Amino acid sequence: MLIDKERSKRGRFIMTGSCQFAMMKDLTETLAGMIGILTLLPFSILEKRRIPDSGAETAYEYFIHSALYGSFPEVCVYPEIDHKYWYSGYLSTYLERDLRNLYNIGSLRDFQRFLQLLASRCSQVLNMSSIANDLGVAVNTVKNWISILEASYIVYLLPPYYQNLGKRITKSPKVYFLDTGLVCYLVGLTDRDHLLKGPMAGALFENHCISETVKAFFNQGLRPAIYYLRTHNGLEIDLLIERENRLYLFEIKLTKTLSLEYTKPIERFKRMFSKLNIGKGSIISLSDEEFSLSRDVSAQSMNGYLRWLQEFS
């Protein structure tokens, strides 16, 4: 192989392509120790800003665009593409080429129903038994399907944070899609009014924020050190980011108007777990303004949050 002839010369070969399970398996088996793998997720907001005439400037506009049109390169760079037609082709290719040929996923119809059901439960704690019951399939089948979606970067499972917090913590992950546009396509959301006023509005904005967080880590070559928290006595924190043994707490709210009420979960967490090393908390919202809400919690714009993530590493 050419790569073996001059091992001292690094970075001579760059291979790109969509997620091909078989190709990745062969590469890691034959080139172990000789390759670096970069995971390229759908475009982040920061990447979309480099596209001329992207049509979005504020956090509100980027959320609308990401939800209704998605973040895959083709639909972002070429706005004339019918995104619904593109998603239909994307799913057909993904199902028929990448999955049917490589995995025994069983009924394609059941798997498509599973995708739609999972999309309707984005930003929720993953309950495989409930999904299996609703679909009439075995729990192990759902586990297998989830693993496939995770391996192909369709979904991201956000683990719970329960280190040193005792046993009364929810320990199942929450499920997020790495492209919010795919969620909207799967559940049939096609216009702004239904997006912002429908029952999934808050979940979709949370999905948008978590997916942007995951992309920020991956785009810097880092594995996300991110979590959520839910206790059995009702305390919930949407996002915890850990760095150098310090926790940063975030609540995600689909609103442009913030109040002190939104600071209560973060302040309660600080009181309950005062021995932990906790940084200042933040509320991420559709507002483009940044200011202090309380001594321990600030309002942080999406733009400010993304800048903070860039500096974070």
Predicted regions and their residues:
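Interdomain motor-coupling "hinge/lid" segment immediately C-terminal to the ATP-binding subdomain
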Residues: S18-N127
